[in-house]
């Protein structure tokens, strides 16, 4: 069939006799001949089956039934078939198949839509799903060689996505929705700016690549030249070994492909059918090398034979590749940026030949491919480009520099660079095993809460951090709606920078999951566009303001904007709060001083724009609550954002002091408007309009609009824009009426959502201190996408289609279940799901630059370790904190005490470590483990301590904070100040033996 380029055939396993669409395969049931004349013929396949019109209806996946499907069997079609030229064929010639004896609609049609596995029914002429064409068997191309998956494989590292089918032949969801092998199965690698998508093909291995700055379009406002994030192109490695073919016996065995998140390495492995030779292909996107590198090897010497070619990402990127000296390159120019891509092949053994058709390697032991690409985009140039003349030299130098190193050197520096970020955090749920392919892991996820389900959740958290590192380093631009990965010239929503939640959500995990450096490309983009370019200042002017800056919902990388909702000018406030958030986690005062002018000018925009309402509060004029309901003054979304902006700006002024350089008039105006600002925290009473299955009538909910009721919106809408106060901010306090009203609003909205919306809801329910409800949303998010929200088999989040923000939202939400600190208190296990019975999460970051490790068993903490990186003071809250033994490693002014609410205030010098040990497993620094058999005994009478045993040389008494209370050579001594304390007594004998005893003073 012309649409979808699929072949007609019958089931090869005999499950039914219907004619369906299949991926091309050289099997007898797809090879057809026409017997008769062009106006009266029969269709018979090589298996001897005739096509006929059945009168037995069949159900259609997309709904309904096909009343007269085509089937195959021994019956010839009465009256035969004829062909007529298809009208309005846009991509090549084609025909319509007509059932001559059928009345009414008699043209064969893909029934129910264009997707693999659809049956063929009958419809009227001139439908796009009618058109078919014929190809000779010798001219047919196939997706890939056949392959048999490996058995009993377990990846080296648990945090690995793995599969036993290539992306080239894996089945797609039958409902269509624009799904592709790329979206469903390709595996992403990225160095933060330059990335690739891996398919694991055998006959023709594809690395489809992207570069974050390759955009069409210009810096214009609301024009047809807005542009798209473009597919850069693909490099192919075609198998020339002669060891495989497309027949059922000529395929590969022992196949698997994987993405190891621990090392950020892709891999494909397969063997010949008899298992005698194994081929391995490994892939990295190296930040140090600024290139993608692949290595192709075989288990026997001289068995690697490949042809390398490269194609630009047509139709958006149209360029011709030229080949010379083992390299291929193409270049060109879009409306603003110029681009250049180059690869180089390095062979170890065998021969290398370059022709006009590509680079061929024959009989090599090893082949290394180096791929680099770049544009002349420069975010700090007024024209957004620079050094166009040097672009080719830049890309060539990256290729040459990498080619001059061995694979092992490139791999080692890549892994070391990646792991210094990725290894900071470790999340483990007890009992998890990664023993089944990831697509099967997803399919089995809905079956329960066992080890497989927990493994998928653990993997999904790690994947979010992996994608953050892979998409947000290098150039000062944020990751877009798809991170940096895209295989289309016109992707959904242009794969742009969406400012009404999506780009912000991309960075929700950055600070709390200890990836502050990955936040910087977004933050520097905000500062640069606000301070150094004119577009955002122009949008502020267009909104009627003489000071400040703003942007709209849809943004390209040149400051250009789309047409959607130009009255959404509150994005500047949301952006500016990210600048402050980075300071809260890092305490980088020089950074704050740099970006503060952008915070101040955003505040000035709103200081000038706010209007005084009749109730005496300041309101934002004519805003709307994304993406529904009326536009009006004082919508809760905008009010909460301005409140956070003003609060952050005032806090920054306090930190910077005179360095803030704020005029007295501005400071007074800011403070006055902050004090009188409508906070967007009004409530209304739900009247049961949308039913009472979620909440009952008479329940208090937060108002989304100040002057319109909740009925102005849509029931179950995907945005929760009036709940900024709950997440990402902390404007409502647990235990208060406003907090409960916010929770009620969440209940009313329901659990249904798009992919990114579920990412938000996971965070909201974690902030609501309801871990089980948060996990319900996580369960929904990890359901395989069959046309709607969920995940694809490569764990890409599905809106649908693919949007990466949901990956990041879920990652942040899982961290929120274990630790929260946005309210300036470290809350331990605030929303632990009951299914996460035992596990640990280490390396999380809290505000004020504290690092937090938590281990728990049976739903309760067993050890909490908190590191005070910069000598700050912060409360820590955990319900059972009073039950812990407390150890302090470092100098503190006062002993750590816990109040009746489970709160301890932590203070100390930089580097101080606090350990809250609940099960006695912690071993203080410098203290030997306490063993049940001791060479010495300790007796206590009152405040007197007596040591019995031979040859006692020294006795040291240590409190539970790791401090030495007493050191003596005496075997009897008093502890005057130790009443009621638990202590460690360390006894050293003359022969060097050490015994330790835990004692409790009366």
Protein language model annotation of sequence segments:
Residues 141-564, 583, 600-603, 613-618, ...:
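Aromatic-residue-lined binding/catalytic grooves and analogous aromatic/hydrophobic interfacial grooves
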Residues 620-652, 656-657, 802-803, 849:
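C-terminal, helix-dominated tail/subdomain
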Residues 581-586, 590-591, 602-612, 666-713, ...:
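Non-catalytic carbohydrate-binding regions of carbohydrate-active enzymes
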Residues 890-892, 897-899, 926-1002:
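C-terminal outer-membrane/trafficking sorting elements
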Residues 1-143:
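Lectin-like carbohydrate-binding module/patch detector with strong preference for beta-trefoil
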Residues 87-91, 127-128, 134-156, 918-934:
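Low-complexity, Pro/Thr/Ser/Gly/Ala-rich linker/spacer regions in secreted
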Residues 500-511, 568-580, 637-648, 721-730, ...:
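Well-ordered alpha-helical segments within folded domains of soluble proteins
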Residues 39-41, 292, 862, 872-874, ...:
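Structural beta-strand segments of beta-rich domains
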């Amino acid at each position: 069939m012309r649409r979808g380029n699929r072949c007609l055939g019958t089931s090869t396993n005999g499950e039914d006799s219907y004619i369906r669409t299949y991926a091309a395969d050289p099997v007898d049931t797809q090879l057809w001949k026409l017997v008769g004349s062009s106006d009266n013929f029969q269709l018979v396949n090589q298996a001897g089956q005739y096509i006929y019109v059945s009168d037995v209806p069949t159900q259609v996946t997309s709904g309904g039934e096909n009343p007269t499907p085509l089937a195959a069997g021994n019956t010839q079609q009465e009256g035969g078939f004829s062909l007529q030229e298809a009208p309005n064929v846009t991509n090549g010639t084609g025909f319509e198949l007509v059932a001559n004896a059928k009345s009414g609609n008699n043209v064969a049609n893909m029934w129910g839509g264009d997707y693999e596995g659809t049956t063929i029914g009958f419809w009227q002429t001139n439908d796009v799903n009618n058109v078919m064409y014929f190809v000779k068997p010798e001219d047919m191309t196939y997706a890939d060689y056949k392959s048999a998956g490996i058995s009993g494989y377990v990846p080296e590292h648990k945090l690995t996505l793995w599969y036993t089918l290539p992306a080239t032949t894996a089945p797609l969801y039958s409902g269509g929705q624009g799904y592709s092998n790329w979206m469903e199965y390709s595996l992403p690698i990225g160095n933060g700016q330059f990335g690739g998508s891996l398919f694991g093909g055998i006959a023709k291995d594809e690395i489809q690549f992207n570069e974050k700055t390759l955009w069409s379009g210009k810096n214009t406002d609301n024009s047809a030249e807005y542009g798209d994030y473009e597919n850069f192109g693909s490099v192919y490695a075609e198998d020339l070994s002669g060891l495989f073919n497309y027949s059922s016996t000529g395929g590969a065995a022992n196949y698997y492909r994987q993405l190891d998140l621990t090392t950020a390495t892709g891999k494909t492995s397969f063997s010949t059918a008899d298992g005698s030779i194994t081929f391995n292909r490994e892939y990295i996107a190296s930040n140090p090398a600024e290139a993608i590198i692949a290595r192709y090897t075989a288990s026997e010497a001289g068995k690697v034979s490949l042809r390398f070619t490269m194609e630009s990402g047509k139709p958006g990127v149209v360029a011709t590749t030229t080949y010379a000296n083992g390299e291929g390159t193409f270049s060109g120019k879009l409306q603003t940026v110029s681009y250049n891509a180059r690869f180089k092949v390095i062979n170890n053994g065998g021969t290398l030949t370059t022709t006009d058709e590509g680079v061929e390697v024959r009989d090599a032991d090893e082949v290394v491919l180096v791929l680099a690409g770049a544009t002349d985009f420069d975010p700090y140039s007024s024209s957004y480009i620079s050094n166009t003349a040097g672009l080719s030299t830049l890309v060539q130098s990256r290729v040459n520099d990498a080619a001059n190193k061995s694979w092992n050197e490139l791999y080692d520096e890549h892994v070391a660079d990646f792991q210094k970020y990725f290894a900071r955090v470790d999340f483990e749920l007890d009992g998890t095993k990664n023993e089944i392919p990831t697509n099967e892991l997803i399919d089995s996820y809905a079956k329960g809460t066992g080890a497989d389900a927990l493994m998928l959740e653990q993997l999904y958290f790690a994947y979010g951090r992996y994608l953050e590192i892979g998409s947000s380093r290098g150039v000062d631009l944020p990751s877009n709606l798809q991170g940096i990965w895209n295989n289309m010239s016109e992707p959904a929503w242009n794969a742009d920078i969406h400012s009404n939640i999506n780009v912000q959500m991309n960075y929700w995990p950055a600070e709390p999951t200890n990836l502050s450096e990955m936040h910087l490309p977004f933050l520097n983009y905000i500062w640069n566009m606000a301070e150094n370019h004119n577009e955002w200042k122009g949008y502020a002017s267009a909104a009627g303001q003489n000071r400040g800056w703003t942007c709209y919902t849809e943004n390209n990388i040149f400051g250009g904007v789309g047409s959607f909702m130009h009255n959404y000018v509150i994005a500047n406030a949301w952006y500016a709060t990210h600048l402050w958030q980075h300071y809260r986690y890092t305490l980088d005062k020089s950074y704050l001083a740099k970006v503060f002018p952008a915070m101040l000018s955003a505040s000035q925009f709103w200081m000038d724009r706010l209007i005084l309402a009749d109730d005496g509060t300041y309101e934002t004029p004519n805003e709307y609550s994304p993406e529904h309901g009326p536009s009006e003054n004082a919508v809760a979304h905008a009010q909460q954002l301005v409140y956070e902006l003003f609060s952050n700006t005032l806090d920054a002024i306090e930190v910077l002091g005179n360095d803030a350089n704020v005029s007295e008039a501005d400071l007074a105006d800011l403070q006055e408007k902050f004090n009188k600002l409508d906070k967007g925290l009004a409530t209304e009473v739900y009247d049961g309009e949308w039913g009472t299955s979620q909440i009952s009538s008479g329940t208090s909910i937060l108002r989304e609009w100040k002057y319109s009721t909740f009925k102005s919106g849509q029931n179950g809408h995907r945005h929760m824009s009036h709940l900024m106060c709950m997440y990402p901010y902390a404007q409502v306090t647990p235990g208060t009426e406003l907090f409960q009203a916010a929770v009620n609003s969440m209940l009313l909205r329901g659990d249904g959502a798009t992919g990114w919306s579920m990412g938000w809801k996971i965070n909201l329910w974690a902030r609501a201190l309801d871990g089980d409800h948060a996990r319900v949303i996580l369960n929904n998010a990890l359901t395989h996408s069959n046309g709607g929200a969920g995940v694809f088999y490569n764990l890409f989040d599905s809106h649908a289609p693919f949007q990466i923000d949901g990956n990041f939202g879920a990652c942040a939400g899982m961290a929120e279940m274990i630790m929260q600190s946005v309210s300036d208190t470290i809350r331990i296990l605030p929303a632990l799901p009951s299914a996460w019975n035992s596990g640990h999460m280490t390396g999380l970051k809290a505000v004020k630059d504290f690092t937090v490790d938590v281990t728990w068993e049976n739903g309760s903490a067993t050890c909490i370790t908190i590191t005070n990186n910069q000598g700050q003071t912060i409360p820590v809250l955990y319900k059972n904190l009073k039950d812990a033994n407390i150890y302090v490693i470092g100098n503190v002014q006062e002993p750590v005490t816990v109040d009746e609410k489970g709160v301890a205030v932590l203070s100390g010098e930089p580097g101080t470590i606090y350990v809250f040990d609940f099960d006695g497993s912690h071993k203080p620094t410098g203290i030997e483990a306490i063993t049940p058999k001791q060479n010495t005994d300790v007796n206590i009478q009152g405040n007197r301590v007596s040591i019995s045993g031979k040859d006692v040389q020294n006795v040291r008494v240590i409190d539970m904070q790791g401090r030495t209370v007493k050191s003596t050579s005496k075997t009897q001594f008093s502890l005057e100040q130790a009443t009621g304390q638990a202590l460690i007594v360390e006894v050293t004998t003359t022969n060097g033996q050490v015994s330790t005893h835990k004692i409790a003073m009366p």
